[in-house]
């Protein structure tokens, strides 16, 4: 199934990291979003007929505030009632940075294991390299490099 990663607060950036790792390492489509945003629109998509093609991953923190905990539980319940698989990844650590890195590490490893389970080399980046090569041939990289170096930062 296609991973959809949901984070909140500082875990929104972690959700994006996990999405990109599933894309690059596992070579699968993956999506991410943040709570509470998803409860204003995206939650409706789980009522659709394609919903069973996804696995929803919630990034959790044992110290999340009461309101966020209630929101996550309510959202999770609706998604499970729609028949989807839900996974919760719990952060570990004594401070925000440790918790973020614990989830990043777990996501990175999961993306590599998924690639290996699918018989795919997680370090091969054919499509990315092909795009870079086409850009280089078109002179875009050189042009961008010149533009960036001319910026006064």
Where are these regions (language model features)?
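A SIS-like phosphosugar-recognition module
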Residues: 1-153
């Amino acid at each position: 199934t296609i991973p959809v990663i949901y984070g909140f607060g500082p875990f929104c950036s972690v959700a994006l990291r996990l999405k990109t790792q599933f894309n690059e390492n596992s070579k699968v489509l993956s999506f991410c979003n943040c709570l509470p945003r998803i409860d204003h629109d995206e939650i409706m998509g789980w009522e659709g007929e394609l919903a069973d093609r996804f696995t929803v991953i919630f990034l959790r923190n044992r110290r999340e505030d009461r309101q966020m905990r209630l929101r996550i539980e309510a959202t999770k319940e609706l998604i499970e009632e729609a028949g989807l698989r839900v996974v919760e990844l719990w952060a570990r650590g004594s401070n925000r940075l440790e918790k973020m890195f614990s989830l990043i590490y777990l996501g990175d490893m999961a993306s590599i294991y998924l690639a290996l389970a699918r018989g795919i080399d997680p370090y091969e980046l054919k499509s990315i390299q092909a795009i870079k090569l086409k850009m280089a041939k078109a002179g875009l990289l050189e042009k961008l490099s010149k533009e960036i170096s001319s910026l006064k930062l």
